[in-house]
Amino acid sequence: MEKKKRELDIVLLLILLASAFLNIYNIWKDDTVNPYYTAAVTSMMQSFHNFFYASFDAAGFITVDKPPVTYQIQTISALIFGMHGWSVILPQALAGVGSVLLMYLLIKPTFGKTAARIASFVMACTPIAVAVARTNNVDALLVFFLLLATWLLFKAIRKGKLIWLLAAFFVVGVGFNTKMLQAYMILPAFLLFYLIAANATIKKKIVSLVSALAVLAAVSLSWPLIVDNIPASKRPYIGSSQTNSVLELAFGYNGIQRLTGQNSGGGQGAPNKDASKEMSSSDNTQAPPNQSSSNSSSSDGKSSNGNMAAPPSNGQMPSGGQGGPPSGGDGGQGGPGGDGGKGGTGTGSKMQSGSGMFGTGTPGPLRLFQQELSDQISWLLPFAIFGIAGLLIAGARERRRLSVEQKETVFWVAWLVPIAGFFSVAEFFHHYYLIMLAPPIAALVGAGWVALVHLYRNQTGWKAWLLPGAIIATTGFELFILRNYNDQIGVGWSIGVGVIGVLSAIALLLFKQRQKPFSYYVSLAALLALLVMPMYWASTPLLYGGNSSLPETGPQLASMSGKGMGMSDATVNEKLIKYLEENNSGAEYLFATTDSNTAAPYIIKTKKAVMAIGGYSGSDPAITLTQFKKLVKEGKVKYFLASGMGRGGNNDIVEWVEKNGKEVASEKWQSSSDQKTENTDSADTSSSKASGENGKMGGPGGMNQSATLYELHADE
């Protein structure tokens, strides 16, 4: 018996290998991924001070907009393997594989090996989960931490040991220091499950939960309270905050604003709804003009996960409200190579072409079924809903007490429903946040399939018909999703999905009395057929290149063909770097500029400090004019690059620079011919082609023709 427990599940191994392939293959072609965060890792490698605070720049002037845990893990990876795009992606890619394994371990003890295999395979094939795992955004690691916490919680229930419960909430606290309040979205499920599943008196349950919540609070607030209690003069400014406070960042910008979409003031934070709509539809918006218009892409001209100057994971508008990223494509006309259309038409970025803020659809109860979001996460959501009914019915016992199967079903439902509800009404989120829904959907599909097959075999009436009903409903919904892509991928896929789904359902309806293996294999074949299109969607970042700043999946990536929304490789102006290094006279900062998008590629390329006076958006009140003048007087800042894209929230500093600085002749530092730059990537939405041909757009790292370099003198 002991030997049997240790047997290797070959099917699981194959699923893990498939997950590893989807998450890892070709990540080595993405040199700097999301430059905003890669710049931070570059800086964090240089000192423990930067490592602790997640400093964006090497001088420790300002932090990124998230807690440090993910970037500390990425920094350790970069220290081990060297600073490469793939080395900062690798932790997230492995976390994605780890999440697939955890799904198996969570489902198998109660629902069996088949359910566990299906759940892990669904998790591996979830399109947005794969897309996020192939970037340096934090969400893949967050989901891994939450699933690890869930495994510890389940162990606490089975073992009846308080230590496992405390460990579970400890890990959720680590999740808070990964992406703040997003980690708390699963707390309702944790609390409810422990109350209904723990074998203890209600008094003991409450005492245990209070203890666990105390651990959660201690771990969650450890880093924020330490940072907030350190004098501001001895630490970096907290990026994307208005009051230089981690707690304000957590509960304001990374908290309530995610739900309301309201601006916190000062031009920073979530754009308002009208600004978002303008960003999504405008043909004239530009990226931060910090790139020579003639610079081209990296040496190989390839990127597996291209980037864009859209908010790295937060939705801020670069350069002080100059709109969002360019509309993409050649010359910025709609989606790459064309008109973009409505969300899900098969061309253009979903953020550009979809309705609602950041192309996430119209808030409402059916938002997850709208074309803007459904192809990223919801393919099997109808099957999961039927699975809930099947699990609650099949798990029922003669006694009125909930069975173990029903209790765990309640847990996954309590994870799914509140988070689905949040995304149904929230104003301020991106497509890749939907990875939070991947675990409960995978669990309910895997366990639900087994329950539905059991009901089909052993029940009569409507309970028996839940299985064919689930197949028909899910088939119909997949055809609804595919209808917008038939012109691009061919109608054959829709026909194939429809035929297999309908024939499977008919076979189950007509031949119910056949022997049991028949129903098992027919229903399994139907489910696998329903997984074909999600798996294709999940593979599109490998096939066509992705978007490292705002990950998404789908055939529309093919139309970008490496030159659309987020597909271009970032470049820096080599002539500018050479000029600054020759003339900087030992200043602490290579140069100062308005925003992090402009600064990031230069930090990555030179490993030197570049001051972004307004943080990511250009509007953080990170430094006053008096403080800036003091730095100039001390010789720490000698050059200022005005991007020509507006002054952000630091008008007084830019005005002072323009009035007192000496303009450097453009021929001394601006390139006039193509210069390929290795080991850099774009965080911009405009392509290098558009940059080169039009002379008007530039990704972060160079400048457009309106950029100006000023020399500042200490005696000013």
Swiss-Prot record:
The organism's place on the tree of life at top rank: Bacteria
Topological category with respect to the lipid bilayer: Multi-pass membrane protein
Region (Disordered) residue spans: 260-363, 664-716
Gene Ontology terms, MF aspect: pentosyltransferase activity
The EC number(s) this enzyme carries: 2.4.1.-
Comp. bias (Low complexity): 290-307, 680-694
Transmembrane segments: 8-28, 44-64, 87-107, 118-135, 137-157, 159-179, 180-200, 206-226, 376-396, 409-429, 433-453, 462-482, 491-511, 518-538
Coiled-coil residue windows: none
Extent of the signal sequence: none
GO CC terms in record: plasma membrane
Keyword set, alphabetical order: Cell membrane, Glycosyltransferase, Membrane, Transferase, Transmembrane, Transmembrane helix
One Pfam family recorded for the sequence: PMT_2
Ranges of biased composition (kind: Gly residues): 318-347
Record keyword Transferase present: yes
Biased composition (Polar residues): 278-289
Protein's UniProt keywords contain GTP-binding: no
Location in the cell: Cell membrane
Gene Ontology BP annotations: lipopolysaccharide biosynthetic process; response to iron(III) ion
Family named by the database record: Belongs to the glycosyltransferase 39 family.
Official protein name in the record: Putative mannosyltransferase YkcB
Species name: Bacillus subtilis (strain 168)
Lineage: Bacteria, Bacillati, Bacillota, Bacilli, Bacillales
